[in-house]
C-alpha cells in the first residue's frame, strides 16, 4: 500500500523528511527563537526596555501565520492549529495536579449526596466504578493523541480532523457552551456556599462580584496563572479527600467521639440499594450514572492543556496515568466511606440542591459522628472546588473559542492571542457571560440556571464519545496509510479496544439519562423535566444536521486513507523518534516485572 497521502499528491513542492510532509512556507516565515520553556517567540516580541511599554505591548496580537492560499480549507486549518501562538508554560507538576484533582468538584463533594439518596451505597460504587473505567480508557486515548498532536484546541481540533467537519462543529460548539454556562453557575454556587456560615442573602451580589473578579484576574496571568492556581486548588482538594478517607476508616471502626463499630450496618439497614422494588432499584442505579458522569466532567482538560505544556511527550502520559489514582483512591474509596457512614435515607439528604454544602455527604458524615469544626473546613474546600471549576471554565472556553475560530467556525477575531499567549477575546467573552451570575439575587434564579444548564447538560458525554471515536479513527488511518504503532511515543495502555469500551459506556449513559429524564426518580414524568435533562441532545443533532445541509457534505466520516496524520506532529523525524522509543524500551526491559506493570498502567 502506498504511503503517499492526498495532501502530498496535491502539494509536490512541499518537502518530505522521514515520511513527514513539511510545508515549504514554514521555512520562509520570520525568524523565531526557542527559549528553554519551549515557546516560540517572534523577534518583534522582545522587550523595549520600558516595563510600562512592554506591559502595553503584551496585549498586542501575535501576528497570524500566513498559509498558502492554494491549499484546501482542511489543510489550512491543520497548519494554523499546528502553529499555535499559545505559550508552553505548563510544567509537569501542573499537569499532574490538573489530572489528579482538577475534576474533583461539587459533583463528588456535594452531588454524591443526591446519588446516595436516589441509588443507595452499592449504586454509588457501581455507577462511579463503571464510569471510571470509561474515563480511564478515554483519557489514555486522549493522552496518545495529545502527545502526537499537541495542537491548538487539542481534542476539539481532532474531531474535525479525524471524524468529520460537521461532527466537529456540533460537538465543539456544545463543549464551548458547556464551559460558557458553567462559569456563572459556579460563581452562583460559590455565593450560595457562603450561606453555610449564616451569611445574610443581601450580600449575595457582593460575593458574586468578588468571586467573578478573582477568577478573571487569575486568567489574566495567562496559562501560567491558571496552572499555578489549579496546582494549589487541586493540592488542597486532594489533601482533603485523603484526610476524609483516613477519618472515615477511623469513624467506621468506632474511633470517633460517639464510639461504636459501624462496619456495613447501613448496607443492611436501610439497604445497599434505594427503592422497594427491583424496578425502583434499577432506576436508582441509572440516576447514579448521570451524577457520576457529571462529577467526572473536566477529566479531558489534560488533553486541552497539552498544547501549552513544556514537554508534552513526557508530561502528558504521566498526567494521564494519574487518572487511575483519582478514580480508585479519591472517588471509589471516598464514596465507599460515604456509603458506610451515611444511610441513604438520612434526612439531611432529602430535597437538597446540588450546591447546598449542608447536604454534602462529607459534611453529614462528620457532623453525624460528633466532630465539630471540621464541617466548616470541608465547606471551605467545597468553596475552593467551586472556584477551581470556574477558573477552568474561563481557561477551557477561551481556548475552545480560539480553536473554533481557527477552524472557521467562529469569526476570526475569536482567534486573537496576545504576545503573552492569552486568548483575550475568548477570555473577555467568557468573563462577560459570567456576569449572568448576578441573577443570583433574582427569584427566578433556579429556573434561569436550570435551562442554561439544560443547553449543555450532556456536553461531557458528547466530548468523551468524540475523543474515543477520534482515537479509533486515528488508528484506522494509521493502518490504511501503511503506518505502524512504532511511531507512537506513547500508546494507550487500553489500546483501541479501550476506546470501543469508552464509546459503549457513553452510549449506555445516554440511555440511562434518557430513562431517568422520562421516568424521574421520586417524581412524575413531565415535558419540562425531560427537556431540562435532555435538551442538549436534540440541540447537538440540529447543529450537526444543519451543518451537513449547509456544507452539502453527506459523508459520515473522512476516509481513513485521506486523513492528515502528519501536520502538527511534535516530532517530525520519525527515524530518530523510533530510535529513542527503542532505547526507552531497552531500559524498561531491565527493570523488575512489578515496576514494568506499574509503569504501564500507572
Curated annotation (Swiss-Prot):
GO terms for biological process: amino acid transmembrane transport; amino acid transport; polyamine transport. It is found in: Cell membrane; Endoplasmic reticulum membrane. InterPro entries: AA-permease/SLC12A_dom, Amino_acid_permease_CS, Amino_acid_permease_fungi, APC_YAT. The keyword Transmembrane applies. There is a cross-link at residue 76 (Glycyl lysine isopeptide (Lys-Gly) (interchain with G-Cter in ubiquitin)). GO terms for molecular function: amino acid transmembrane transporter activity; beta-alanine transmembrane transporter activity; L-phenylalanine transmembrane transporter activity; L-proline transmembrane transporter activity; polyamine transmembrane transporter activity. The keyword Secreted does not apply. Residues 117-121, 186-204, 257-280, 343-376, 443-451, 511-529 are extracellular. Its main location: membrane. Induction: Expression is repressed by ammonia. Expression is induced by polyamines. Both GLN3 and NIL1 bind the 5'-GATAAG-3' motif within the GAP1 promoter to activate transcription. Active permease is phosphorylated. The addition of glutamine causes rapid dephosphorylation and inactivation of the permease. Ubiquitination by RSP5 and the RSP5-associated proteins BUL1 and BUL2, leads the addition of poly-ubiquitin chains being specifically formed by linkage through the lysine 63 residue of ubiquitin and mediates ammonium-induced endocytosis and degradation in the vacuole. Residues 1-95, 143-165, 225-237, 299-321, 397-421, 473-491, 549-602 are cytoplasmic. It is a multi-pass membrane protein. The chain crosses the membrane at residues 96-116, 122-142, 166-185, 205-224, 238-256, 281-298, 322-342, 377-396, 422-442, 452-472, 492-510, 530-548. Keywords: Amino-acid transport, Cell membrane, Endoplasmic reticulum, Isopeptide bond, Membrane, Transmembrane, Transmembrane helix, Transport, Ubl conjugation. PROSITE patterns: AMINO_ACID_PERMEASE_1. Changing residue 297 to V: Impairs basic amino-acids transport and regulation by these amino-acids. It holds the Pfam family AA_permease. GO terms for cellular component: COPII-coated ER to Golgi transport vesicle; endoplasmic reticulum; endoplasmic reticulum membrane; endosome; fungal-type vacuole lumen; membrane; multivesicular body; plasma membrane. Signal peptide: none annotated. General amino-acid permease involved in the uptake of all the naturally occurring L-amino-acids, related compounds such as ornithine and citrulline, some D-amino acids, toxic amino acid analogs such as azetidine-2-carboxylate, and the polyamines putrescine and spermidine. Senses its transport substrates to set an appropriate level of transporter activity at the cell surface. Required for FLO11 expression and invasive growth. Belongs to the amino acid-polyamine-organocation (APC) superfamily. YAT (TC 2.A.3.10) family. NCBIfam families: 2A0310 (TIGR00913). This is General amino-acid permease GAP1.
